Each structure stands twice: as structure tokens, then as C-alpha cells.
Amino acid sequence: MRQVVLNILIAFLWVLFQDEDSFQFSTFVSGFIIGLIVIYILHRFFGQAFYPKKIWIAIKFLGVYLYQLITSSISIINYILFKTRHMNPGLLTYETNLKNDWAITFLTILIIITPGSTVIRISKTTNKFFIHSIDVSEKEKESLLKSIKQYENLITEVSQ
């Protein structure tokens, strides 16, 4: 976070030092790029990774989540319109490797927001999720657990 604020500060200082009559977005962008270069050179002194890596991870995370949201929404629409009699609702468990409370909460929110599944309970001792799903057939169960594992890996990547 400090790196982002510092980069924006460098960009604004660059705009001020250019002595232009009005604010030019192109000057701000060039200052932002200069700030990126300065921060890249000095990022070892911050004790953190260079921040554009985190931005890329967040964009990748958003893309994966939007893909999962769209595909699960289409799947739920398919169940509602055509397979109402063939639904197999039930519970399944998922054991997570996440340790932070915020990471577990974030994973819970992602599972709840995804259509067709909700978290019923989280075991505090074993970090096991009890999840209700609209269909726990072998194929759907495998698909749901795969997407949850993908969320977990991305949360782990973001938190490092």
C-alpha cells in the first residue's frame, strides 16, 4: 500500500514540477511510470514485493472469479429450467489450508456468492467447510471442489 501511495505522490510531484498551465493526464502518466521505475529500484528497502505483481494477481483473481460466477449462473439456470427433477442437493466437506481468519472469511464469501452453493458451517479446529450444494453428483461435486481449490490458491497467492 505504501508503494502505491508513494507512486501516486511521485506522479503528482512530476506534474507540479513540469510547470504546465493546466493538468495534463499524459504528464501524470509519465510521472507514474517514472515513479514505477524509482519504486522498482528502491523496493528492496520497503521489505515488500514490487506492487504491480500484486495488481496482476488481483486482476487474475477477478478474471477467474468472474468466469466461475458466469459458468455457475448458467448451470443454475439450466437446473431451474430443465433439470428440476434431476437435482441431487446435499452436503459436502472441504478442508482448507488457509490459516488467516480474513482468508478463510474471504473464501467463505466467494463460495456463498457463487450460485448453487453455500457454506453451512466452518469447523474452527480443522478448518473444514461444510457446504450445501444444489447438486452433489460426482461430476458437479468434483467441479465445485476444483473451483474452491482454485479460489484458495489465488487467495494464498494474494496474501503472500
Curated annotation (Swiss-Prot):
TM annotation in the entry: 22-42, 61-81, 102-122
Disulfide bonds: none
Subcellular compartments: Cell membrane
InterPro entries: Cation_antiport_E
GO molecular function: antiporter activity; monoatomic cation transmembrane transporter activity
Domain of life: Bacteria
Family: Belongs to the CPA3 antiporters (TC 2.A.63) subunit E family.
PANTHER family xref list: NA(+)/H(+) ANTIPORTER SUBUNIT E1, NA(+)_H(+) ANTIPORTER SUBUNIT E1
Quaternary assembly: May form a heterooligomeric complex that consists of seven subunits: mnhA2, mnhB2, mnhC2, mnhD2, mnhE2, mnhF2 and mnhG2.
Protein name according to UniProt: Putative antiporter subunit mnhE2
Gene name of the encoded protein: mnhE2
